[in-house]
Amino acid sequence: MRSPYLIGVFLAAGKSRRMGQNKLALPLKGENIGSLSLKTALSSRLDHVLVVERTEHASLEWIGAPYHAPPFQKRWSLHVCQDAEKGQGHSVSSGVRKAESMGADGIVILLADQPQLSVDHLNALVALAPESFAVSSFLGAFTPPIYFSSTCFPYVKGLKGDEGARRLLKSGQLGAGAVLEAKDSGELDDIDTPEEYDMVRRAMS
């Protein structure tokens, strides 16, 4: 029996409005926010990572040379979402459609602005791999990364606008899933504002 083929859908198509500049390119721990988040995904047990961007050029601002060379080069590919401007739901559904066309048995929704996420947490989520979904949580608050099996794809592909995957979990449409509690809140924090960026820089210094 073969192992499930799992693809990470790495959401990097946001416009960073609250930051005022491309937050993924902001320096952090010798790299930048986006590359540190991507490194975690590429170092995990995921078989492949789809980087979902709004344009091909946008990815060049933060994906550095190390990710275009071994050992990372063949572990990821770029997927441009033509409707990214319409909201995150479109990026999610577009990424899942692409992953499905690549033969994915399951996908993990990942955020490009979660640089404190650990490989251990991501691997633990993948190891759960239930028949429906597995979601990360801290003190009861659900957040990416979120695993979805192929049985959930029809629902996830229906997301649009600013709808997030969490709405599906709360709707009950997907049945019972698994919850993986993070060891600390910082691991699941995303970065949207200059204040949050400063906090993460201090935490990771």
Swiss-Prot record:
Biological function: Required for xanthine dehydrogenase activity. Could be involved in formation of the molybdenum cofactor required by xanthine dehydrogenase.
Family annotation (InterPro entries): MobA-like_NTP_Trfase, Nucleotide-diphossugar_trans, Xanthine_dehydrogenase_PucB
SUPFAM superfamilies, A to Z: Nucleotide-diphospho-sugar transferases (SSF53448)
GO molecular function: nucleotidyltransferase activity
Protein name: Purine catabolism protein PucB
Domain of life where this protein originates: Bacteria
Organism: Bacillus subtilis (strain 168)
Residue stretches in coiled coil: none
Keyword Acyltransferase: no
Entries under Pfam families matching the protein: NTP_transf_3 (PF12804)
Induction note: Expression is very low in excess nitrogen (glutamate plus ammonia) and is induced during limiting-nitrogen conditions (glutamate). Expression decreases when allantoin is added during limiting-nitrogen conditions.
An example Gene Ontology biological process: hypoxanthine catabolic process
Metabolic or biological pathway, per its Swiss-Prot or TrEMBL entry: Purine metabolism; hypoxanthine degradation
Keyword annotations: Purine metabolism
